[in-house]
A protein has these predicted regions:
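N-terminal accessory/interface modules of nucleic-acid-binding and processing proteins
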Residues: 1-233
Length: 233
C-alpha cells in the first residue's frame, strides 16, 4: 500500500476517532487552536501524528528562513497536498523536532497577556457591535462573536452537507435537527478554540455535553463541514 493511501486512510480513521466522544473532539481542538494557520484536514493529520505540536513548518522554511535544523531521525508529519492535478504528500516538522543554529530564531507564538484583555474586549465590542450584556468579560464577548460568526455564515457552512450525509449517522436525522445541532456545535467549537488561543478556560461556560452531537459526524465526509467552520475563524 502506498504512503499516500496510508495517509488518506489515516485521515478517515482519525476523523472517526476525534468524533467518537466530546472529550476526543476537545482534544483535537486543543491541537487545532495552536495551528490556526492550517486548514482542517491538515490540523486533523497533525493531531493524528503529533498531537502536542505547537508550530509546524516545512524543512525548507525551518532551514532557510528560521535557521533551525531538523533533528536527525525526526519524522515528518505527512499532509495531503491537493493543490495540483494529482494529490501528493508534503511534510512538515514541529518546532520540537528542530534545533537552532547560528543566526537562528524561533517563530513568534502569540500569547495573550493579562493587561491585553481589556483592549481586546474593547476591540471585539466595536468590531462586532456587541451588546453591553455580552461584554461583561472576554469569555462572554468571545461567545457572542462565535454566535455571530456562525449566524452570518451558516448557509455557507451547511452548503452540500445533505449530500455528504449518506452512510453517516446524520442520514437518519431530519433537516431541522441537523441544522440546529450543527449551529450549536459550530458555535461552541469556535468559542472553544478562541478561548484556547487566548489562554482562557472554555469549560467555564461550556460542558462536555455541549459537544454530545459530535458523534453524529462520524465520517470525514461530514466532519469536514464542521471542521472547516471551526478552522476558518
Amino acid at each position: 500500500m502506498s504512503k499516500l493511501q496510508d495517509i488518506r486512510e489515516l485521515a478517515q480513521e482519525h476523523a472517526t476517532l476525534v468524533s467518537s466522544s466530546p472529550r476526543d473532539w476537545m482534544g483535537y481542538m486543543d491541537t487545532a487552536a495552536r495551528l490556526y494557520r492550517y486548514p482542517f484536514t491538515d490540523q486533523l493529520l497533525i493531531h493524528a501524528q503529533h498531537p502536542q505540536a505547537t508550530a509546524c513548518a516545512s524543512l525548507e522554511l525551518w532551514n532557510e528562513k528560521m535557521f533551525r535544523w531538523v533533528n536527525r531521525g525526526a519524522r515528518g508529519i505527512a499532509l495531503l497536498d491537493e493543490n495540483g492535478h494529482n494529490t501528493r504528500l508534503r511534510y512538515v516538522f514541529d518546532i520540537s523536532d528542530t534545533h537552532m543554529v547560528a543566526g537562528g530564531r524561533s517563530p513568534y507564538l502569540w500569547q495573550m497577556q493579562e493587561h491585553q484583555q481589556e483592549e481586546i474586549l474593547t476591540h471585539l465590542a466595536e468590531a462586532y457591535g456587541l451588546e453591553e450584556k455580552d461584554t461583561g468579560s472576554l469569555s462572554d464577548a468571545l461567545m457572542a462573536v462565535a454566535r455571530e460568526m456562525v449566524a452570518d455564515s451558516l448557509e455557507e457552512y451547511l452548503d452540500g452537507l445533505e449530500y455528504a450525509a449518506e452512510g453517516t449517522y446524520l442520514e437518519d436525522l431530519d433537516e431541522v435537527t441537523i441544522r440546529s445541532d450543527f449551529r450549536q456545535l459550530a458555535t461552541d467549537s469556535i468559542y472553544y478554540m478562541l478561548c484556547r488561543r487566548c489562554g482562557l478556560e472554555p469549560m467555564e461556560l461550556l460542558e462536555e455535553e455541549d459537544f454530545m452531537h459530535i458523534t453524529d459526524y462520524n465520517r470525514l465526509s461530514v466532519l469536514t463541514f464542521l471542521g472547516n467552520a471551526a478552522s476558518q475563524i
